[in-house]
Every structure is written in structure tokens, then in C-alpha cells.
């Protein structure tokens, strides 16, 4: 990238901060709250443009606010309190996100993913499903879906899951039937398989709390704004009917709307069998990994009254180290995990400050006045639809969640009649499901889009069709099922 095009990415967040800070102070807001919001908005712009990695953007924002805390973070009344030391208080705020249980849950889930990858268990599971179900193209679509479904609960990076585990396997399948990329033969079987790869990644990202990092970011934002939260089991149970429906419906729907020319064949099962033979029998490390994952899932679903989900993850990671499934170097060298750890903790810190300075409360009251007179159900559905469609304007799920989720939560808090747990779960599901809309919405999207099997027109058309179906089903289950199990 040329320096001339690089500098605007650095200057744009600073310009946004300056413009907002110089605007007239809105009625009902204190000056420090407005200045805090200016810096927060600048951070969001930085996350979208990424002049530097997202974690660095967030850390710079926190540093600015902490250093200038007498003017950005604390009110004159707080500063006037006897014994109030803004230096200690600002430091305490700056690192508060790193003690959030959500951060440690997602870090543990990353280590689970490392265990899957290092032992080869994730690849083995996918190959077994392909071998057993690959004789018919439709069943091969279900094999892709089930592979994603099994890996999703313990792989919080949908990019690692979709682009790092599933894609390297399924990209080998079309050439077995002479279905080549960027060629008329791509529709033979390759286009269907690749579309199933990305759509399965989006669906499974919405099914489990730990299937996608922005899901956990949303819960952190929800907790910082309201002290309410959703457990792993709450999320799973609330999504259960929609999850079952989508897992069973999507492969068939893709088969109907984007039909492969080739309907059956034996080449894929034979290839998968060859790969499994090369891997050898299930080894002891894979068995230990499988046992720990089953135990973690059971505790996440049923153990919420006895042990926190983050503590389950923390303990399982300790056992993985003791059982030599992973080693300490695997933890300290996991760049993806530490990257998410820092940006997620930093964003939760920033969201907490947005609430502490009173901005969320002020914005909620502002919305309450404009939304009064409308049915809470209509407002909730309208907010979900707007949130969902705004995905077209974001190329990062993290930036999308960071920018819009606090506003969505504030809007829900403005109307006490809106059930916050239900609304937040619908928002969370929309993050994953809405990732299907564009070829840039989430990490694996460009990988599948660039495979040569999904022409631009087809991707946008299918994204709109599947996106609309997902949205309708989400609203229906959100109104009929989720209140029954979450309230």
C-alpha cells in the first residue's frame, strides 16, 4: 500500500474525534461524557479502517482516555470527592476488561481449537463424515454442515474453523470429479460444496456462544451496560429450535436453489478413506481430547448452577496441559488467541466506560422518547432488521458488533417492556447469520469467494436469499420460542 493512501487511515479516526468533540454539547450530557464518546467513535472508525491491528487501535484509545481521564472519564463531582485518585481509578478502569470472565472463556476455547488442530481430531471428524456421507452430493452438503457443527462449540474463531480446517479439506473434493475453479465445470459439484462451506460456517457461528468471538463480545457489552448476561446454556437452549431447523434445512435448500449437476459418485469417499488410512487409528491424545471436549460441553450446558463457564474452560485447558494434549509453548505462541484476548478485553473496557460516563443511560432516555407509543414487539423486530441489514456496510464482524451493539442494547434498555435477554440473543444470532450476506462480511467469506467456484453474481444473489430466510426464521423463533426459555 502506498504511503499516500495509508495516511488517511491514520488521520480519519483523529478527524472523527476532533469533529465530534467540537460539536455543540447535546442537552443532558456532561462534557466529559461527550468527549469520551468522541474517542470511542474514533476507535470504532479505527477498527473499520485498521491502519494498525484492531487490538492496537483499542489499546491506543484506552491509553488516550486513561491519560486524559480528568477530562474524559470522570465527572467534576467524582474528582472533587475526598481521597479520589484519578490515576489509580483510571488504571483500574483501563485493565478492567482483562478480568472479565468472557475474555477467559474465549481464550480457553481458542486453546480447545489448538488441541483439535494439534491432535488432528478436527480433521479426522470431518474426513469420517465425508467418507460416510459423500456418496451423494446432497449428503456431502450435510457432511460439511455436521463437521462445522461439531467443531463450532470449541472453535471461537470462525476463520480458523471455516478457512483453517474445513476449507482445506473440501477444496480437494471438486477436482476428484473434474469440477475445476473459474470454469464451466465448477457448477458440476464445486459450487455447491463451496457454498455449503461458507453457509455452514455462518449458521454454526450463530448456534453456540463460543462459535464466534463477536458473540462473546456482545455478552460482555450486555453485561457492562445492564449487569444482565446470557450463559452458554442459555444461548444454546434459546437457539435450539432454530439451530435444528437450519442444520437440517440449509443443505437441502442449497441443493434446490444452487443445484449441482453431479448428484452422486464414489470418488470423494475413496479419497477420504485414503486420507484416514494415512492418519492411522485414533491415537490416545485424540481420545483424551475427545473426552475433555465432551466433558466441557456437558458442563457448559448443564453445569451453570455449579461452575462458571469460564472456569470450566480454564480447568480443561489445565488438564490439556497435564495430559500433554498441548504444551505451554502452544499457549504462549498462539498469536490468534492473544490477539483476540487483547482486542476483546480492550473493547469491553471501552464499552464499560461508555456506560460509566452515563452515555448509554442518556442515549436510552433519548430513544425512549422517540419510541414511546410504539409496540415493544414492533420496536424489537425493527431494531433487529436494521441491525441485520447494516451488515452490508461492514467488512469486520468485530467492528460491526463494536459499533452497533452498544446502540442496540441502549435502545432495548430504553423500553423496559423489551426482554433484554431475548433481544440480545437475537442480536447475537444476527451477527453470525448475517455474515452470509456479502463476500466480505466475515473471515472465511473471502476465502470461499476467492475459491473460483462462486461467481460474484451467484454469491450476492444467494447471500440475499439465504440472508432473508435466516432473518425471517430468526424473528419468528425470537418471538415465539426464546421468551419461553429465557424469561
From Swiss-Prot:
The keyword Transferase is assigned to this record: no
Compartments it resides in: Cell inner membrane
GO molecular function, one term: antiporter activity
TM spans (from-to): 10-30, 33-53, 54-74, 93-113, 137-157, 189-209, 236-256, 292-312, 313-333, 340-360, 370-390, 393-413, 418-438, 462-482
Membrane topology field: Multi-pass membrane protein
InterPro entries according to UniProt: CitT-rel (IPR030676), SLC13A/DASS (IPR001898)
Keyword set includes Transmembrane helix: yes
Residues spanning the signal sequence: none
GO CC annotations, alphabetized: plasma membrane
Keywords: Antiport, Cell inner membrane, Cell membrane, Membrane, Transmembrane, Transmembrane helix, Transport
Enzymatic reactions: (2R,3R)-tartrate(out) + succinate(in) = (2R,3R)-tartrate(in) + succinate(out)
PANTHER family in alphabetical order: DICARBOXYLATE TRANSPORTER 2.1, CHLOROPLASTIC
Family recorded in the similarity comment: Belongs to the SLC13A/DASS transporter (TC 2.A.47) family. DIT1 subfamily.
NCBIfam families: dass
Role according to the record: Catalyzes the uptake of tartrate in exchange for intracellular succinate. Essential for anaerobic L-tartrate fermentation.
Protein's name according to its UniProt entry: L-tartrate/succinate antiporter
Amino acid at each position: 500500500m502506498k504511503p499516500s493512501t495509508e495516511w488517511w487511515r491514520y488521520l480519519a479516526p483523529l478527524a472523527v474525534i476532533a469533529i465530534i468533540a467540537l460539536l455543540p454539547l447535546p442537552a443532558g450530557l456532561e462534557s466529559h461524557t461527550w468527549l469520551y464518546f468522541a474517542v470511542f467513535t474514533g476507535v470504532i472508525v479505527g477498527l473499520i479502517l485498521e491502519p494498525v491491528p484492531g487490538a492496537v487501535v483499542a489499546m491506543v484509545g484506552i491509553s488516550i482516555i486513561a491519560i486524559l481521564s480528568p477530562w474524559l472519564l470522570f465527572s467534576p463531582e467524582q474528582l472533587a470527592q475526598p481521597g479520589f485518585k484519578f490515576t489509580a481509578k483510571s488504571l483500574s478502569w483501563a485493565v478492567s476488561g482483562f478480568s472479565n470472565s468472557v475474555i477467559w472463556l474465549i481464550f480457553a476455547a481458542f486453546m480447545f481449537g489448538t488441541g483439535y488442530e494439534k491432535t488432528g481430531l478436527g480433521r479426522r471428524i470431518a474426513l469420517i463424515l465425508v467418507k460416510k456421507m459423500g456418496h451423494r452430493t446432497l449428503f456431502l452438503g450435510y457432511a460439511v454442515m455436521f463437521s462445522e457443527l461439531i467443531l463450532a462449540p470449541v472453535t471461537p474463531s470462525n476463520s480458523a474453523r471455516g478457512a483453517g480446517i474445513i476449507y482445506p479439506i473440501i477444496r480437494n473434493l471438486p477436482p476428484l470429479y473434474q469440477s475445476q475453479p473459474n470454469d464451466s465445470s465448477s457448477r458440476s459439484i464445486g459450487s455447491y460444496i463451496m457454498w455449503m462451506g461458507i453457509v455452514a460456517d455462518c449458521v454454526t457461528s450463530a448456534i453456540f456462544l463460543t462459535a464466534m468471538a463477536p458473540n462473546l463480545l456482545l455478552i460482555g457489552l450486555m453485561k457492562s451496560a445492564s449487569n444482565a448476561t446470557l450463559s452458554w446454556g442459555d444461548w444454546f437452549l434459546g437457539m435450539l429450535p432454530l439451530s435444528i431447523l437450519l442444520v437440517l434445512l440449509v443443505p437441502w435448500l442449497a441443493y434446490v436453489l444452487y443445484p449441482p449437476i453431479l448428484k452422486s459418485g464414489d470418488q470423494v469417499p475413496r479419497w477420504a478413506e485414503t486420507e484416514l488410512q494415512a492418519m492411522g487409528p485414533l491415537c490416545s491424545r485424540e481420545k483424551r481430547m475427545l473426552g475433555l471436549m465432551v466433558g466441557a460441553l456437558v458442563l457448559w450446558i448443564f453445569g451453570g448452577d455449579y461452575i462458571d463457564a469460564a472456569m470450566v474452560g480454564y480447568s480443561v485447558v489445565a488438564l490439556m496441559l497435564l495430559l500433554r494434549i498441548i504444551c505451554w509453548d502452544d499457549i504462549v505462541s498462539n498469536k490468534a488467541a492473544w490477539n483476540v484476548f487483547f482486542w476483546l478485553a480492550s473493547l469491553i473496557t471501552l464499552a464499560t466506560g461508555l456506560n460509566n460516563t452515563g452515555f448509554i443511560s442518556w442515549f436510552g432516555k433519548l430513544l425512549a422518547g422517540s419510541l414511546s407509543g410504539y409496540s415493544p414487539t414492533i420496536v424489537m423486530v425493527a431494531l433487529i432488521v436494521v441491525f441485520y441489514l447494516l451488515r452490508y456496510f461492514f467488512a469486520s464482524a468485530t467492528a460491526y458488533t463494536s459499533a452497533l451493539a452498544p446502540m442496540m442494547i441502549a435502545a432495548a434498555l430504553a423500553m423496559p417492556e423489551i426482554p433484554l435477554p431475548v433481544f440480545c440473543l437475537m442480536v447475537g444470532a444476527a451477527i453470525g447469520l448475517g455474515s452470509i450476506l456479502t463476500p466480505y462480511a466475515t473471515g472465511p467469506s473471502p476465502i470461499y469467494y476467492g475459491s473460483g467456484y462462486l461467481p460474484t453474481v451467484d454469491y450476492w444473489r444467494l447471500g440475499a436469499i439465504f440472508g432473508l430466510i435466516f432473518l425471517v426464521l430468526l424473528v419468528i423463533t425470537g418471538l415465539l420460542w426464546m421468551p419461553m426459555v429465557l424469561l
